[in-house]
Amino acid sequence: MAIVKCKPTSPGRRHVVKIVNQDLYKGKPFAALLDKKDKSGGRNNNGRITTRHIGGGHKQHYRIVDFKRDKDGIPAKVERLEYDPNRTANIALVLYADGERRYILAPKGLKAGDAIASGADAAIKVGNTLPMRNIPVGSTVHAVEMKPGKGAQLARSAGTFIQILAREGNYVTLRLRSGEVRKVLAECRATIGEVGNSEHMLRQLGKAGANRWRGIRPTVRGMAMNPVDHPHGGGEGRNKGMQPVSPWGQKAKGFKTRKNKRTDKYIVRRRNK
């Protein structure tokens, strides 16, 4: 893994910082694990914009990643590491002993040729997936399920991890990267180690066009709009004249948006703000 700062041969290259990983496979992805990825431009079936700042971008295929890791007792070998345009983490193509291939999230330290396994009897080793009741307290994990069998939902981005703080009864207590401490059923699965490609946060796109390649359109400030377009628009000078709100009038700062009271009992400590 190398961090490359581009030479200022043009204004668009002056601030570019790239992450170069020589271990990534340079060929095409495994075709059987690809799916089409349609673009909506942020519009619904009526053609109206429902999500702003979306449109354009390079054509991509979706990589079908195995978040359940449910092939218990069947050893697998890592064939190669690959780039995935749909997520910040890299992915690994693994070959199981029965001949099946699957993509998984590539943990930090995993490389081609490594052996991995899943199931209650799997060893405590980077890349192995186990129910959290079988993982020692204090371990660092990623790709954590919130419901048994549903598949990983937590700690899937580049460089993220979760620490197991305690195990009590049918639940384990986890500390998330946000600082939140919450309880999850001990039968939920997690993968040992942290997600790789942690240097992703150090990259710099360098120009607005790089965001357009990613399908992200410009964001205009509400204060720069007219009154018809945004509550912050218009007026003399640079003054909102009101509490910051969204284009539809919902308070933007300090307004509680969490609605799921049913799961409040599982949150031991709210995230750091």
From Swiss-Prot:
Part of the 50S ribosomal subunit. Forms a bridge to the 30S subunit in the 70S ribosome. The gene is rplB. It comes from the Bacteria. Pfam families: Ribosomal_L2 (PF00181), Ribosomal_L2_C (PF03947). Belongs to the universal ribosomal protein uL2 family. This is Large ribosomal subunit protein uL2. HAMAP family: Ribosomal_uL2_B. GO terms for cellular component: large ribosomal subunit. GO terms for biological process: cytoplasmic translation. Keywords: Ribonucleoprotein, Ribosomal protein, RNA-binding, rRNA-binding. Residues 229-239 have a biased composition (Basic and acidic residues).
